[in-house]
Amino acid sequence: MTSSRRRFLQTASASVAGAALAATVRAAETPTLGMIFPPANYPVPPEATTLYPSGIRFLAEGVGLEKMTPEEYDRVFVRILPAAKKLAGEGANAISVMGTSLTFYKGAEYEHQLKVNVTKATGLPSTTMSTGIVEGLKAVNARKVAVATAYNEDVSHRLKVFLEESGFEVVSVKGLGIVSFADRGPVTPDELLNFSASVYEGAPKSDALVISCGALKTLELIVPLEKRCKAPVVSSTPHALWASVRLLGLSGHVKGYGTVLAKG
C-alpha cells in the first residue's frame, strides 16, 4: 500500500469516527422519550413525528401483548420494568408506558403505582397513556365524559372504573368489541369517526369525548369530531404523546390537532 493511499484511508477512518462521535453527542443532547408499547417489535408511531417532527428523539420497546384481555395484560405486565430499564440504558430522559388498557385495567391506584415503580427502576420521570387521557380531560376542565373504545365489554367497563376513580363521571361507554387487531383488522377512519360521534351523540350531557386505544388512528379525526360534536376530544396516542413530551420540559403545544394540543 502506498503512503498516500494509507493517509487517505486514515483520514477517511478518522472522518467516519468523528461523524459517529458527533452523532452520539447530538443524540445525547436531544431530549429523548422512551416509549413502551403493548405489542412486540412496535415501531415509533407516525403520530410522534407528525406532532413533533424535530427536537425530540423517540425510542420504542414492546412487551409482546397479543390480545386485549386482563389475562394477557397480567402475562406481559412483568415485562414493563425491564423494558423501561432498557430504554433508560439507550438514553431516554423520560419513560411513557404507551398502552391505555394495559395501564388502566387494574384501576387508578395500580396505574399510579406503575409510574412510581418505573421511576424507581430507572431514575427517570414517567407517565402512561392513561395519564395522558386524564391530563387531557383536565386541560379542558371536563367532568362528564362519553367514552368510545376499541375494547370488549369487560375492558371497557374497567376503563369506566378507572375514569371514575380519576374524578370523572362517565355518562356512556361503548366499545367495538375488539380483542385482537390481528384477527379483526384495522378500523377505518370513517368507521371510527362515525362510531365515536355516535357514542357522544348518545350521551348529550357529556362535555368531552374520549377515544381509548392506542391502535385506533385518531390524530386526523380529532378536529372533524370536535366540529361535529362541538366538544373537546381526548384520545390515546395523541394525548399520551402530548403528556409525555411535557416530561421533557417541552410544552407539547401543537396547532391544528384539536383543543387540548392547541392549549399546550
Residue ranges and their predicted role:
Residues V118-F181, A262:
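Conserved beta-alpha
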Residues S180-F181, V233-S251:
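Short, flexible loop segments at boundaries between secondary-structure elements
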